[in-house]
């Protein structure tokens, strides 16, 4: 009877130890999972940056198949100030947030407007661009100059963008959704669309660079604050990126990069 009792007690002690060890292992796993991206970047010396890679002048491939653009210059400068290198990963727009949440990259620096809906899924840094949407038509069009004018018109916008929201705010607008900006610019020039809505910086750059037979016809419809998106729970990383961005603005580096790509001073909030 005593042997049975001793054996039972030993079994209970062993079980308790196993549970304790299992608990510690789980705690370590949970702790590792909560490690801020800033630590991973510091260890690897690489900051993985995602964007579409097809959105000039923000992010696009040049003739040498190298990424360049405003977002690229901003990313490289932030990475330098964090003591790491930027690695660029081109991802389709509708896969950016999903890829971020799957840890395929560390940060999205790709003209993502800060919205309440997106803030449910990701955290944003301070805005690194303030811009706005505009109406764009063919050169001969003169009857679409304000948002109300798109009623009854075929309107091209990027699916899942704030431009889609702007277009859908007008009852009676025939809104067509696209995946690539180049596709709806082409449809506009080929008269399959009456008007498109997109970012004023992007459109002014592309009209000038590519000598497109289209024009911006409206004032800025709404101002958008563009932030860099990171996974939730990475407060240290967000703080470091914000600090680097502030330094860039204070020492004139940000303004220099902005003027390089857009030829004007940055738009205020």
Regions found by a protein language model. Give the residues of each.
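C-terminal motif of bacterial Sec signal peptides marking the signal peptidase cleavage site
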Residues: 17-20
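Extended ligand-binding regions for polar small-molecule ligands
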Residues: 22, 72-81, 159-161, 227-265
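Extracytoplasmic small-molecule ligand-binding "clamshell" domains
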Residues: 30-111, 251
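Short loop->beta-strand "edge-of-pocket" segments that line small-molecule binding or catalytic clefts
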Residues: 45-51, 147-160
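Periplasmic-binding protein-like
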Residues: 53, 130-137, 200, 204-242, ...
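Acidic, polar ligand-binding/catalytic clefts
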Residues: 80, 85-149, 215
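Alpha-to-beta junction loops
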Residues: 84-85, 101-110, 153-154, 189-202, ...
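Short helix-initiation/N-cap motifs at beta->coil->alpha
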Residues: 88-98, 142, 160-162, 176-190, ...
């Amino acid at each position: 009877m005593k042997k049975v009792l001793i054996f039972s007690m030993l079994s209970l002690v062993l079980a308790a130890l196993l549970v304790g060890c299992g608990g510690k292992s789980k705690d370590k796993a949970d702790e590792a999972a909560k490690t801020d991206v800033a630590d991973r970047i510091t260890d690897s010396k690489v900051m993985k940056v995602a964007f579409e890679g097809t959105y000039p002048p923000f992010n696009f491939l040049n003739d040498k198949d190298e990424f360049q653009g405003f977002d690229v210059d901003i990313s490289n400068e932030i990475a330098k100030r964090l003591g790491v290198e930027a690695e660029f990963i081109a991802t389709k727009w509708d896969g950016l947030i999903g890829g971020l949440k799957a840890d395929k990259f560390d940060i999205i620096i790709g003209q993502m407007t800060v919205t309440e809906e997106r803030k449910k899924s990701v955290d944003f840094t301070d805005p690194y661009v303030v811009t706005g949407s505009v109406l764009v038509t063919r050169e001969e069009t003169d009857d679409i100059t304000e948002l109300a004018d798109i009623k009854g018109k075929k309107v091209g916008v990027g699916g899942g963008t704030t431009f889609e929201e702007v277009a859908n705010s007008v009852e009676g607008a025939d809104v067509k959704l696209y995946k690539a900006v180049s596709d709806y610019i082409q449809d506009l020039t080929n008269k399959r669309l009456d008007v498109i809505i997109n970012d004023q910086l992007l459109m002014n750059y592309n009209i000038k660079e590519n000598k497109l037979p289209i024009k911006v016809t409206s004032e800025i419809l709404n101002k958008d604050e563009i932030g860099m998106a990171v996974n939730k729970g990475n407060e240290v990383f967000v703080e470091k990126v914000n600090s680097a961005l502030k330094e860039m603005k204070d020492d004139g580096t940000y303004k220099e990069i902005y003027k390089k790509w857009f030829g004007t001073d940055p738009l205020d909030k």
